[in-house]
Design a protein with these regions (language model features):
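Short, compositionally biased
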Residues: 207-209, 243-247, 418-434
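Short, Lys/Arg- and Gly-enriched loop/turn segments at beta-strand edges
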Residues: 234-238, 411-424
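Flanking helices and flexible, charged tails adjoining ferredoxin-like Fe-S electron-transfer domains
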Residues: 2, 19, 46, 125, ...
Length: 442
């Protein structure tokens, strides 16, 4: 298959990164990639979706990954997977010899191994420059569910209409379920039995980089997990703090221990981000050197500094995120052409063990099986967002009153970076706005 043909199939079928920011997958297909890398590092604590999906559909996913390798002409296809995922590794080893040029790379159980910059270094030894893209190093990264969605688009002619989501923590029956896009978080949580605390908080995504959601929020193409947490949990409390309070606390109790840059994954790969210098400058209104502020652009927001490193429970990640947002609003782009310094010699000893991270965050007791159930959950109504990806929102091609069937395109890719959106249920369109489409099931 030619690259352009595969790009068109992927774009029209709405395949984007099934996690993170939802980068349109078709844009990653280029003959500049001499290595393609599958991310099965399950970056966040408690998440098990990717290892489950890869174990269940090992052959289909590997076959598709090999097809991508041949299409772009990559010399090597690497599956990055944590060495503790024994059952999934066994499933992969049953087929690995069928795919020339494909190999497994076993990873340590540390956080944030799923950060693509970290993963690329671990699997290939290549360092992506600060603010750069993986393809500059000849690498294209795909996660497991994304590759499975490519398989469904190419082999089964099925667009992306549903999402696998894990529901864990304060629920009676932790589970990973397949749900239609646009259903509510509450409907997903209901599949895990009953909640085990009063007034639970829905934490969408992983505990390190996730957000607090509302029960009525719709599931999107990037929704990986819902953590049901007590309202007084440490993670919830950290997420609810305000920037003004965070800044005052930094000014009054930062002890200048320097642990935040010592453990910062990007800093240890030679990137110029330095949380300690930023906190020192920001908390003292010190603008004599602007580099600590400008270098905030290179923060990955992994949260190691804020959730693990700081002995004073300060919030470098949150304040850096505010700075990044302010720079964007002011039209200040990250410096271009910045080259990384040499990788820290002590980097191997500065990795954050995931088991220790879970203990520090009060999550160890939630680390339980969440069995994968593939039967599609049935709902009565969906609210499908037109922007579930990086780039321009899709443009609606249906109107209120139209009858649609599951899998039908309801919004076409816009000009520029964009993908199609499809009906996740069959029914009647009841509302169309510039942000979403509502479909009621008959």
């Amino acid at each position: 298959m030619e690259i352009k043909e595969l790009q068109d199939i992927i774009q029209q079928n709405g395949v984007v990164g099934a996690g993170g920011a939802g980068f349109p997958t078709y844009m990653k297909l280029t003959d500049k990639a001499n290595i393609i890398l599958m991310n099965c590092a399950e970056c966040e604590p408690l998440l098990k979706l990717h290892r489950q999906l890869l174990e269940k559909h090992a052959y289909e996913i590997m076959k598709t990954f090999h097809m991508i390798q041949e299409t772009v002409g990559a010399s090597e296809a690497i599956i990055g997977i944590k060495k503790s995922y024994v059952q999934t590794i066994h499933a992969l080893n049953q087929h690995i010899e069928e795919f020339p040029g494909m190999r497994l790379h076993l990873l340590d159980e540390v956080y944030p191994m799923g950060d693509e910059v970290v993963l690329i270094y671990e699997a290939t030894g290549r360092v992506v420059r600060p603010g750069g893209l993986p393809i500059e190093q000849g690498v294209a990264v795909f996660n497991v569910e994304t590759v499975y969605n490519v398989y469904r688009a190419v082999e089964e002619k099925q667009p992306v209409t549903d999402k696998y989501v894990s529901v864990v923590a304060e629920v009676s029956d932790p589970v990973t379920v397949r749900v239609p896009l646009g259903c509510t978080l509450e409907e997903v949580v209901a599949q895990a039995g009953s909640t085990t605390v009063k007034d639970p908080v829905y934490f969408v995504g992983g505990p390190m980089m996730g957000r607090i959601g509302n029960g009525s929020d719709p599931v999107t193409k990037t929704t990986n997990a819902i953590l049901v947490l007590p309202k007084d949990h440490l993670i919830v409390a950290k997420k609810q703090r305000t920037s003004s309070i965070d800044l005052k606390r930094a000014a009054s109790i930062c002890c200048q221990c320097n642990t935040c840059p010592d453990l910062c994954p990007r800093h240890n790969l030679g990137h110029p981000i330095d949380p300690a210098k930023f906190m020192r400058a920001a908390s003292n209104n010190d603008f004599r050197d602007l580099n600590p502020y400008i270098d905030a652009s290179f923060c990955s927001s992994c949260g190691v500094c804020e959730m693990y490193s700081c002995p004073q429970s300060l919030a470098p990640r949150s304040l850096l995120a505010d700075m990044k947002g302010g720079l964007r609003k002011a039209g200040i782009r990250p410096p271009q052409g910045v080259q990384p310094k040499p990788v820290q010699e002590s980097r191997e000893y500065r990795k954050v063990p995931e088991e220790r991270l879970m203990a520090r965050l009060g999550l160890t007791r939630y680390d339980k099986d969440a069995p994968l159930k593939e039967e599609l959950v049935q709902v009565k109504k969906v609210r499908i967002l037109l922007s579930q990806h990086i780039g321009a929102p899709a443009q609606a091609v249906v109107k209120a009153g139209d009858e649609v069937t599951r899998g039908q395109m309801i919004a076409q890719p816009a000009q520029g970076l964009s993908v199609g959106i499809h009906a996740s249920v069959s029914g009647k369109v009841t509302e169309v706005t510039d942000r979403y489409i509502i479909i009621a099931v008959k």
